[in-house]
Structures are given as C-alpha cells and as structure tokens.
Swiss-Prot record:
This is Elongation factor Ts. Its main location: cytoplasm. One of its GO terms (cellular component) is cytoplasm. It is found in: Cytoplasm. Pfam families: EF_TS. Belongs to the EF-Ts family.
Length: 295
C-alpha cells in the first residue's frame, strides 16, 4: 500500500476542490496515484476542479512582438506584480523579445546564451536587471510563429500581459478577425484547435469518467451510452476552440466565424502568467469576456 502523505492529500485537494477526507479516501482507493485519484473524485461527483483553478505563484508579464511574417510570444517572471509594472522591467521584456525573434533560439537555455550587439549574454542582461530592480527575474518560455503574406496574426494581451494569446489565421489577411479569435482564446482557454487534435487515449479516458458518473447517478444502463455521447460533445466544446460558441456572438460557433473570413486557424499559443506554479490563478474568464463583448 502506498504511503499517503499529508502533502499528497493537500495537492489533490488543491487540484480538485474536494474535501480532505474524500481526497484521502481517493488516494487510498487508487494506491496513491494522483491522476487516478482525480478521476476517482470526478466519477463520484466530488471534484470541483476546473482548468481555470490551476495553481500559480509567479508574477510577471506576457509580451508579443510582430515583425512582418514573424511573431514571438514570451513570458518573463518577477516576484511581485509591482515589479512587473516597472518601466525598467518592461524595457527588458521588450528587448528580450526583439533579440529572441531575431536569433530564433531553440530553447530557453539556448536563449540565455545569446549575446546582444555589445556582446552581453541575455543571461547577464537579466542579472543586471535583477541587481537594478531588486527581484529575481526569469525568462520562463517563448514561442516563435511564422506566416505567409496570405495569412494573419492575431495578438491579444489582457490586463497588460497577465494573459497573452498569439493565433495564426491561415488563408485570411483579416487581422481584426484574428484578434477577435485571440480574445476568445484568452477568455475561454481552449486546449485544442479542433477535435482532431484530441488523442484517442484522452477521449477514452473522458468516456470512462462520464460513464462512471452516469452509473453513479443511478441512470439505467440502457441509456448510459447515449448520455455519455451527449456529455462527450459538451467536453469537446469545453476543450476545442472550433466547437465553442464565439464570445462576441454566442449564437455563432468559432468555426463559423473563422470560416466567414475565408481562413482557418493554424494553431495558437496562450500564456497565463505563472500558470502551473504554486499559487491560485485568478479566474480571468468573466473579466476577459466582458471586455471582449465591449469591443
């Protein structure tokens, strides 16, 4: 039998929102397997977890730079929101974006070794900023995208960079529409562009959880399969961009809005500052959606 530590119970509780005793029971039932315990709680209807309740700790900003047919989105972390709004910090972030987009390093590790025109490594540029500003600063991640003259980038920063989204519309030069799609992604936080990107393994896992949920609700076995397929459709709406109702027009699917531009979504990147590091992430969805609908 696995050793069910208090830390493991705490982690499961943070991820699911379930009660402490329910979390402990789930871990016992699944022999300490955290992912299996999450599924166990979901099957029992005890999990209130959602992707918007990720745990984060870092402050900082996201930033997007477009230059012709190239664009970069990056995240730079600091220890406090106060420093993230500091002019010197913002100048550093802008400079990093320009250097990375020019050199196109393959990784953060490679990026830190790049030198500017004065021969100073990016790692040392950051260290100098740390000494000046007085907080730890980290280049956490970045992604570079390219397009053709027939395509368009959609870039959107929410709350001055708390969330950043970069999307590419292929076959459409409607940059305004591309930005609208980026706003939608910021608000709703899809995981995939379309159902084709969802692995068969993930679909089967979700089907199993939904089946157990229906059975635990006391539904007759002869209608469970039909119910599960209906709920699976709702799952795809939650995670797939093209299946979602467009935030600026809930009567229209994103798929139809994009089709009206004559283009298609060729991928997107969405960064939320500090996601995945220990501290509860604010729920930005309602705030972003209200702002989007006002545009």
């Amino acid at each position: 039998m696995a050793n069910i530590t208090a830390q493991l119970v705490k982690e499961l509780r943070e991820k699911t929102g379930a009660g402490m005793m329910d979390c402990k029971k789930a871990l016992v039932q699944t022999d300490g397997d955290l992912e299996a315990a999450i599924d166990f709680l979901r099957e029992k209807g005890l999990s209130s977890a959602a992707k918007k309740a990720d745990r984060i700790a870092a402050e900082g900003t996201t930033y997007i730079l477009e230059q012709g047919n190239e664009a970069i989105i990056l995240e730079v972390n600091a220890e406090t929101d106060f420093v993230a709004k500091n002019d010197k910090f913002q100048v550093l972030v802008s400079s990093l974006a320009e250097q990375l987009l020019t050199a196109k390093p393959a990784s953060v590790e490679a990026a830190l070794e790049l030198t500017n025109a004065e021969g100073v490594k990016i790692e040392d540029q950051i260290s100098t900023a740390v000494a000046t500003i007085g907080e730890k600063i980290t280049l956490r991640r970045f992604e570079i995208k390219t397009k053709t003259d027939a395509d368009s980038f959609g870039a959107y920063l929410h709350m001055g960079g708390r969330i950043g989204v970069l999307v590419t519309l292929e076959g459409s030069t409607d940059a305004s529409a591309a930005k609208d799609v980026a706003m939608h992604i910021a608000a709703i936080n899809p995981t995939y562009v379309s159902r084709d990107e969802v692995s068969a393994e993930e679909v089967e896992r979700e089907r199993k959880v939904l089946t157990e949920q229906a059975l635990n609700e006391g539904k007759p076995e002869n209608i469970v399969a039909k119910m599960v397929e209906g709920r699976l459709g709702k799952y795809f709406e939650d995670v797939c961009l093209l299946d979602q109702s467009f935030v600026k027009n809930s009567d229209q699917k994103v798929r139809d809005f994009v089709a009206s531009t004559g283009g298609s979504v060729n991928g997107f990147v969405r960064y939320a500052v500090g996601e995945g590091i220990e501290k509860r992430e604010d729920n930005f969805a309602e705030e972003v959606m209200s702002q989007v609908k006002g545009n």
